[in-house]
Regions:
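Active-site-adjacent loop/helix segments that line or gate small-molecule/cofactor pockets in enzymes
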Residues: 2-34, 94
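Electropositive phosphate-/nucleotide-binding environments in soluble metabolic enzymes
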Residues: 9, 28-32, 59, 63, ...
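Residue-level signal for pocket-adjacent positions within structured domains
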Residues: 18, 23-25, 48-53, 71, ...
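Active-site and channel-lining beta-strand-loop segments
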Residues: 27-50
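Short beta-strand-to-turn element immediately C-terminal to the catalytic PLP-Schiff-base lysine
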Residues: 39-40, 58-60, 161-163
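Glycine-rich loop-to-alpha-helix module at the N-terminal edge of alpha/beta enzyme cores
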Residues: 45-140
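PLP-dependent aspartate aminotransferase-fold enzymes
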Residues: 96-203
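Active-site core of PLP-dependent enzymes with the aminotransferase class I/II
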Residues: 206-207
Length: 207
């Protein structure tokens, strides 16, 4: 797409926007979407190959999702996880069954959870939880976490420490202790990195 002024037809000047410029300052403002297509405030059409940084693959303005959200908003929005909600229970059961290969269990068959589900907002939070569980459940105070070089696990401090990208650590030093990194596809290096304080090996097969 051709470059254009940051002064949008909507009257919003992105050069004076108070949103923190975590990445390069945006010069496009999206105002509408349908399926895989997006339109900016200049009326130009784009194909969305990003999907909310690979976390939203259901398309924009999905009518089924819109209707479900509207229906739920008329009943209950968010409550603390101090209490149970119907949908959280059903999703947790579905996840547990999917992970353990019991999605096609006969109707009415007995069900007993094989594990536990913790809902959170992002992959970084999920990784933080994994580190905490590994440390809390490890015997004799083990705390070390081994990850791969050039990996990415999130932007929160411990998740960032797990990333095998030293240049991303430098602006936030000192990083949390206990994280080490080995080259991918080097089993010998991985085995050598394991020692008496290792609590977990944290690898993402797809990066």
């Amino acid at each position: 797409m051709e470059k254009h002024s940051q002064k949008m037809d909507s009257g919003i000047d992105l050069t004076s926007c108070p949103i923190m410029p975590t990445y390069a300052a945006p010069d496009v403002m999206f105002v509408e979407g349908k399926g895989t297509e997006l339109w900016d405030s200049q009326g130009r059409r784009y194909l969305d190959f990003v999907g909310g940084l690979a976390v939203q693959s259901l398309g924009h303005a999905n009518e089924e999702i819109r209707d479900v959200i509207a229906d739920q908003a008329g009943k209950l929005t968010q409550v603390s996880n101090y209490w149970a909600t119907e949908h959280a229970h059903h999703v947790a059961v579905a996840l547990d069954k999917a992970i353990t290969g019991r999605m096609n269990a006969p109707e009415g068959s007995s069900y007993s959870p094989a594990g536990q589900v913790f809902f959170c907002n992002s992959g970084a939070e999920a990784n933080e939880l994994a580190f905490k569980i590994a440390r809390k459940s490890s015997p004799s105070g083990r705390y070390g976490v081994i990850t791969a070089m050039d990996s990415f696990h999130g932007r929160t401090l411990a998740a960032l420490a797990a990333c095998g990208q030293p240049h991303k650590h430098e602006p936030f030093a000192p990083m949390p202790e206990g994280f080490s990194h080995v080259n991918r596809d080097d089993l010998t290096a991985l085995e050598s990195a394991i020692h008496e304080s290792t609590a977990a090996i944290h690898l993402a097969p797809i990066q």
